[in-house]
A protein has these predicted regions:
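Cytoplasmic helix-loop-helix junction between adjacent transmembrane helices
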Residues: 115-156
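Juxtamembrane intracellular "pre-TM" segments in multi-pass secondary transporters
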Residues: 9-15, 201-224
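Conserved MFS/SLC helix-loop-helix module at the cytosolic interface between two early adjacent transmembrane helices
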Residues: 71-110
Length: 224
């Protein structure tokens, strides 16, 4: 069992030396957001028609996702401080895969909305942890450089989402478009499992106490 009182310099060193892998992981984790929203958009008219749903219901699949994504990060931060980044990442990406499968197989619009809400919660865990990893491993200047490289990868992912989503929807149907999110998440999960060690040097056993939660909330709100 890892001590909560001792830093973990060996793990930090391995991660720092493998900057290329860290950049790739960051790009994929941050890329979950445009993949989950932009790739989904071309499929929205088809799935709305397929379910015989209203446009209001269709828009709710996006609204619920984004609300869950935003609010869940208030809790994922303290949880990752208490348990570490790796458990939160693995748990988050696992839930994302399950929710993405549920979206692709959804029998009706209500099930899709529920699955998209869960997907937003899972996406919040992954995106929050990605930003925290940079703070764990690098000084501000070096961290900005690493994040800049990751954002370049994110931009590439974002640019391909709408064309890929449109192609899959037109040629294979909206369920296949949503299934591509499962593949993206599985690849990301495999890389996390194989190549990502814990980046947090010291766990915080008090992270879930009311005082710590309030401090974290104020910090997040101040950056909005």
């Amino acid at each position: 069992m890892k001590s909560i009182d001792q830093p973990l310099p060996a793990q930090e060193g391995r991660l720092k030396r493998n900057t290329a892998m860290i950049v790739l992981l960051l790009a994929l984790l941050l890329g979950l957001q445009p993949v989950t929203t932009d790739l989904y958009l071309p499929a929205l008219p088809a799935l709305t028609q397929g379910f015989g749903a209203s446009m209001v219901q269709a828009q709710l699949t996006l609204t619920a996702l984004l609300l869950a994504f935003g609010t869940s990060q208030l809790f994922w931060g303290p949880l990752s401080d208490k348990w570490g980044r790796r458990p939160i990442l693995l748990g988050g990406i696992f839930v994302y895969v399950i929710s993405a499968i549920t979206c692709a197989l959804a029998p009706n619009m209500e099930a899709l909305i529920a699955a998209r809400t869960l997907q937003g919660v899972a996406m919040g865990a992954c995106v929050m942890a990605a930003r925290a990893i940079v703070r764990d491993l690098y000084e501000p200047t070096e961290g900005a450089r690493v994040m800049s490289q990751a954002l370049s990868g994110l931009g590439l992912i974002a640019c391909t989402c709408v064309p890929v989503g449109g192609f899959l929807t037109d040629w294979m149907g909206w369920r296949w478009a949503l299934s591509s999110l499962v593949l993206f998440a599985l690849v990301t999960a495999l890389l996390i499992y194989l190549y990502f060690d814990e980046s947090l040097q010291q766990l915080n056993p008090h992270a879930l106490q009311a005082k710590s939660l309030w401090a974290s909330t104020k910090k997040i709100v101040s950056h909005l």
